[in-house]
Amino acid sequence: GCSCTNPQVTEGNDFYFRVCFIDPFQGTVMANYAYQNGAKNAAVITQLGDDYSSGLGSYFKDAFAKLGGSIVSEEQFQTNQTDFKAILTNIKAADPDIIFAPSSITTAPLIIKQARELGITATIAAGDTWENSTIIENAGADSEGVVLSTFFDEAEPANDEAAAFIKGFKEYLVKEKQEDIIPAVSALGYDSYLAAIKAIEDAGSTDTAAIRDALKNVEIDGVTGNITFNETGDANKDIAFIKTIKDGKFQFLTTTTVE
């Protein structure tokens, strides 16, 4: 897997491995970033019935509280909801330093624009799904300053493999006349391919059980960094990239860990 971040995906399935980090890690990383950058009060917005949104929001809340921060407002919204003024009004009254709102790329611009229309100046943050140019296109100038966590930064190649991938993918994007930004999920997809190929080579077979057993011991220097797998098939990763939207583009801010 390359983009499935819910921890339950690999539980009880010894044939499933993934190269991305998982939501408990991502939520903690974002809480650490927020607290380390001066946020003491946070609001959290999540979507009812959405495992990604509710799970990531919960992990952020727990980690932020453990650091000594206060969750001053918790709001939820329904699937397909487009008017967020009521919950944002509640949040404005709570006066948070940061709003953590893990949600879809369809919902994100609506939350961002309506928050700014209400005069909310708090930093708005989310997880990896927000690294999508659709948000910038639809939220416009209101998206400036949004912060998110992601798996990869093309400006900082982790190794020679990453540099070669970036060069090749950039050439492909130019050829196809697409936006010159490499999605993190594409880098993760490439790493999934590298891990699978290495496991097949190590197994010397295409037998599924043999490949599974080989994956348990695979180590690759992938586009998103060094990758090995733990006993549940999750990637052993200890770092996330924090990006912000500045001048209409996603720009690297820093790296953060769970420590």
Where do the protein language model's features map onto the residues?
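Hydrophobic alpha-helical segments within soluble ligand-binding/sensing domains
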Residues: 19-43, 54-56, 83-85, 108-109, ...
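Second-shell loop/turn segments in exported
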Residues: 14-20, 46-49, 89, 148-156, ...
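Flexible loop/hinge segments that line or gate small-molecule binding clefts
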Residues: 1-17
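Sec-exported extracytoplasmic/periplasmic mature domains
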Residues: 32-40, 61-69, 89-96, 113-120, ...
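Segments of small-molecule ligand-sensing domains
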Residues: 172-187, 195-249
